Amino acid sequence: MYQVSLKQFVFLLKIKSTTMEPHRKHSVGDTTLHTCHPCRRTIPYRIYAVFHTCGIIALMYHHVHSLLTANTTLITSLLLLSDIVLAFMWATTTSLRYKPVRRTEYPEKYAAEPEDFPKLDVFICTADPYKEPPMMVVNTALSVMAYEYPSDKISVYVSDDGGSSLTLFALMEAAKFSKHWLPFCKKNNVQDRSPEVYFSSKLRSRSDEAENIKMMYEDMKSRVEHVVESGKVETAFITCDQFRGVFDLWTDKFTRHDHPTIIQVLQNSENDMDDTKKYIMPNLIYVSREKSKVSSHHFKAGALNTLLRVSGVMTNSPIILTLDCDMYSNDPATPVRALCYLTDPKIKTGLGFVQFPQTFQGISKNDIYACAYKRLFEINMIGFDGLMGPNHVGTGCFFNRRGFYGAPSNLILPEIDELKPNRIVDKPINAQDVLALAHRVAGCIYELNTNWGSKIGFRYGSLVEDYYTGYRLHCEGWRSVFCRPKRAAFCGDSPKSLIDVVSQQKRWAIGLLEVAISRYSPITYGVKSMGLVTGVGYCQYACWAFWSLPLIVYGFLPQLALLYQSSVFPKSSDPWFWLYIVLFLGAYGQDLLDFVLEGGTYGGWWNDQRMWSIRGFSSHLFGFIEFTLKTLNLSTHGFNVTSKANDDEEQSKRYEKEIFEFGPSSSMFLPLTTVAIVNLLAFVWGLYGLFAWGEGLVLELMLASFAVVNCLPIYEAMVLRIDDGKLPKRVCFVAGILTFVLIVSGYVFLK
């Protein structure tokens, strides 16, 4: 029989009550911590892939034959090139359908004495107190500090890359409030351990204790928001004498781009307890690395590497959780779920990280902007999980610290012994020599002539450091696991306007191209390191921006042909006509099936495919252009923080009603508006031609019809709406001019 101590039994009982899993039958003495099963749709998908591949080969034959016999060489070449890109991108998607798997973990069976649990370092990143409100950071920090996990094993590091005294003040307030919040959560087995979420819930406790805690939270929130609104921390608000001096560092010369290192221990598990002296408080450390205008800081990857070094000096926990500041913990048993994999003797040696999906709160009914990223964070993940494992998505990831120091069989030693991944820390985190070394490794020139960013830590060279780092770890031989419990492990906020969505994804497109066009390209280095299927799977993301080419060609060329009654597709009487129909229905049908099988709705899928088109005409296109200009040294790009603050009530109401929010004028809306106008004109003229001239250009008309239905929100924003979220008149006017130019140009090539 498997035996546990009384203390261990009580701790496991708490974990079991937080897992929210349905009852499962296990044999007596069964200590299996997790299981893995292949998806049932694998074989049918492989069979379909064979038939679809045959269809693509036939289509390529048709294109080549047309190219050799047709007079319109340019048009045929564009269609051929577009279909080559579409075929390649379909192949990348199919590689992720090759071996999808589902995993289940059993945290209630994780047996260890509380003192034997491994230490856990949590990294939370923020960069702007106005785009990422400090109270959001506070709630994320408190939610992980309150994990159902030995508190003395948890160390929370908050990286403030904006170097803001407002964020530091908010965390000081959080440290004081945590002494009431953490005991309350653990005594009452609270599931929602983000205070904002808990006190907004209709199911929360109304006891005197709960109401008292709520009053404390509202007082804290009021103080923090007052400080943020005023833009400075007034002396009257600093109630703890030991922290008064740290705010003197914010002098007139202090800027977000040029300032010294600030490391402040706000809570120490060795000394801090709640008022009843029954509960130990976890470590809470504020870190703002040194910045200089003459030194490269490598954006978020640089901030994470600083935390990796600072935590290595202070606590050096073997497990690291990375979180964005808006991604609060939604399940207090999450660390134990990760341990089911990270401590399994069968796989732990080569396991680099356990990735949880990103889940977003407040998503509209049918996810109008496709911000749940269902394919990115769920569908593709189970496909990757059957290969080398899921890619890293920037947050909600438990890392094996050893994974940042070379391949499983090839440890790369850091430049100083204090940063070795297996070192046991034997000094208090607030010891003078420990803090001195922590300040040193957070310096802006510390990484010069070291392996940081190239062979050690998070990797530099791409704006999407999460994708690039996970990819490089897989290339080195590390594996990963996708953990998707029924209760979401983490929840966050998503953009609520189209301009925020496409701006964020333009940055992703640029970063992914930086990987695709590099010495570590997935199609070459990736295939060599991980094998054909996994390497091609990584191309699904690296080549994101390439979607823009076929979308532009198919968004304009057939429609212009329709306006001039010049055929670019086979007519309905031609047998090749049906090949286009079958390939289109097959690709879209399989995409719909993927979506629905993973719990999506039909309306959600429709919006998802529409946003795929919108991205192709905006973020992917402009990302490709900006990357090209940067490669030619004609421009540079930086890292723009996506705003998580949403105080516009009217915008929120429109979002809930699923009305598109275009917002301010942006050049990224020009191609989108132009393609909407061109397709509407082509649809009207093609419909007239169908009745006036008989057979008509059916495929061209069907394509224009499909585009018009997808563009209905754009027509509404152009003509019918008068609210602030409508398309700006300037965009509509310029798009009208571009439409005229395209139609006139079409006469040259199509007549």
From Swiss-Prot:
One GO cellular component term, please give it: Golgi membrane
Origin species = Arabidopsis thaliana
Name by which UniProt lists this protein: Cellulose synthase-like protein G3
Q: Write out the annotated subcellular location.
A: Golgi apparatus membrane
Say yes or no: keyword Iron present: no
The gene coding this protein: CSLG3
Biological process GO terms, please? cell wall organization; cellulose biosynthetic process
Keyword field contains Cell wall biogenesis/degradation: yes
**Which UniProt keyword terms apply here?**
Cell wall biogenesis/degradation, Glycosyltransferase, Golgi apparatus, Membrane, Transferase, Transmembrane, Transmembrane helix
Q: What is its main location?
A: Golgi
The signal peptide here is: none
